[in-house]
Amino acid sequence: MPYNCCLPAMSCRTSCSSRPCVPPSCHGCTLPGACNIPANVGNCNWFCEGSFNGNEKETMQFLNDRLASYMEKVRQLERENAELECRIQERNQQQDPLVCPAYQAYFRTIEELQQKILCGKSENARLVVQIDNAKLASDDFRTKYETELSLRQLVEADINSLRRILDELTLCKSDLEAQVESLKEELLCLKQNHEQEVNTLRCQLGDRLNVEVDAAPTVDLNRVLNETRCQYEALVETNRREVEEWYTTQTEELNKQVVSSSEQLQSCQAEIIELRRTVNALEIELQAQHELRNSLENTLTESEARYSSQLSQVQCLITNVESQLGEIRADLERQNQEYQVLLDIRSRLECEINTYRGLLESEDCKLPCNPCATTNACDKPIGPCVPNPCVTRPRCGPCNTFVR
């Protein structure tokens, strides 16, 4: 607030009436809060009739200088106070449009990053579900593979047993062929023996016939031989047919077994080929699923690292903004404290100025109206002032002329 109307602008004249005379005995005490200003100015009997004392002039000059310096300091403090109030108003006006948009931008960035993090989490969840599905599919394929492998092992065991049976049948066939050969050889031996016996019998019968021609009637040996030959031939034919029928039956059975075994072998081989193809396809698909899982895990790791770095950057940005906000708040607190200090200084200066005003007004009322008069100081006009105050003059009362 301005103080131009509160105190008079003091100036000292060159005459004797421009300065009050303060005796040395009046400097004993000072006013509280008024730096070394005499408190008993005008209360002691220091009126003179002619001239002023040099100490009184110096005291008035000191008071005028102090008052001028205080007024200048008050004006400077008023200017600084006005500047601080303008700065505070500008800061209060600029605080909302400056801080809020910045925080809104940060909030938008944080929301975008949160949306990205949520999208990344959903993508990670989807990838985890896909990985679980791939694991379930791989487990299913592994179960199928183990089942097919067990079936393959069973089929291979059956094929091995059928191969053993085929080997046994081959051995039986070779044994039967050997038996047929031996029977053929035996048949040839029997034929040879039969021929030898027939020849022997013929020889014997021929001798007997010659002997018995004279003794007995003749016997038809050809018929007997033919009958014997027919009997043996019928027996040989019967044995041959039985052997041929048995051989044919065994051969047909073996052929049937071989055909069925070959069909089973072909079907087993086809199944084995199909199982091998299925196993290869499953292995390829399993390898693809493993590669997909590895790629998804790598993508997940990269996403986590990227989002963690972005989150750390956002945290650093938030920390910086919070530190700036703390600095701004500390600056505002410091300015408020300075403002309070200035207000306290202002109040003290106002008290001191009021003290000066009261002191000057009281002294103005106590000084005589005509310090140069010898009889009545208040009724007669003021005399002319001496141009040279240092010249010795008659002693008179103090001059109470102030220029407002």
From Swiss-Prot:
Sequence segments annotated as region (Tail): 364-404
UniProt-recorded name of the protein: Keratin, type I cuticular Ha3-I
Gene name in the database record: Krt33a
Further information: There are two types of hair/microfibrillar keratin, I (acidic) and II (neutral to basic).
SMART domains: Filament
Highest taxon, organism lineage: Eukaryota
Region (Head): 1-56
PROSITE patterns for this protein: IF_ROD_1 (PS00226), IF_ROD_2 (PS51842)
Gene3D superfamilies attached to this UniProt entry: 1.20.5.170, Single helix bin, Vasodilator-stimulated phosphoprotein
Domain IF rod: 56-367
Species, as recorded: Mus musculus (Mouse)
